[in-house]
């Protein structure tokens, strides 16, 4: 991404609205522009605080984030991104919906440093109670309910990871993963079926993360 220059107009900030809060609002709610363009953050009235809007000639739809979802301060949400109730985006994670929609289902977690991005015609769809591990990359793929993508794994365009499946850490997934199976390697291959208790534990793991996110957000899950 090209170097971006930001101008922050804060002269009309209302009392009690911090610069950090402004930055968070800019990440969550505003259109973005092409990397080559100069971006100006312009204040606008929202919820008692002046909100920074990233303006430019090519804005994308604003994110839609449920009131009970949690986004860490250092995470980035751009464009056509939808986050359902109880979902969470952890520190330095990126959901960039500038080319295609990204949807994150209820109770799903996108952990530290993970990246979600799509290509035209290849959106990212994350189901319910899904875990995406630290530094994983999900690009133009579908993760069905209850699956888990391990640390540093990569899931590429057009792939569907079936419900309850487990992608081992560091794997590169280039083809569909059957539901309830363990895949590993680069390229990833099916190693075995998962027992029902392992699939259930993945679902519970996602629920634990949802509760942890709620504690970070200081809300009741």
Functional labels for PLM-detected ranges:
Residues 52-89:
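N-terminal segments that cap or nucleate solenoid repeat domains
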Residues 27-46:
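N-terminal, intrinsically disordered charge-dense segments
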């Amino acid at each position: 991404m090209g170097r971006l220059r930001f101008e922050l107009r804060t002269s009309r900030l209302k009392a009690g609205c911090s610069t950090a809060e402004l930055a968070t609002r800019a990440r969550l709610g505003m259109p973005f522009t092409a990397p080559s363009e100069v971006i100006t953050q312009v204040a606008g009235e929202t919820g008692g605080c002046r909100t920074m809007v990233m303006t430019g000639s090519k804005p994308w739809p604003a994110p839609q984030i449920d009131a009970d979802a949690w986004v860490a301060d250092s995470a980035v949400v751009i464009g056509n991104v939808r986050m359902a109730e109880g979902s969470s985006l952890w520190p330095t994670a990126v959901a960039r919906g500038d080319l295609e929609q990204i949807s994150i289902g209820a109770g799903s977690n996108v952990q530290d440093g993970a990246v979600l991005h799509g290509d035209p015609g290849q959106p990212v769809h994350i189901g319910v109670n899904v875990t995406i591990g630290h530094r994983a990359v999900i690009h133009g793929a579908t993760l069905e309910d209850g699956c888990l993508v391990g640390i540093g794994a990569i899931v590429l365009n057009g792939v569907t990871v079936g419900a309850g499946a487990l992608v081992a850490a560091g794997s590169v997934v280039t083809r569909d993963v059957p539901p309830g199976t363990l895949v590993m390697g680069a390229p990833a291959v099916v190693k075995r079926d998962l027992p029902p208790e392992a699939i259930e534990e993945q679902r519970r793991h996602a629920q634990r993360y949802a509760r942890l996110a709620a504690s970070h957000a200081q809300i009741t899950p």
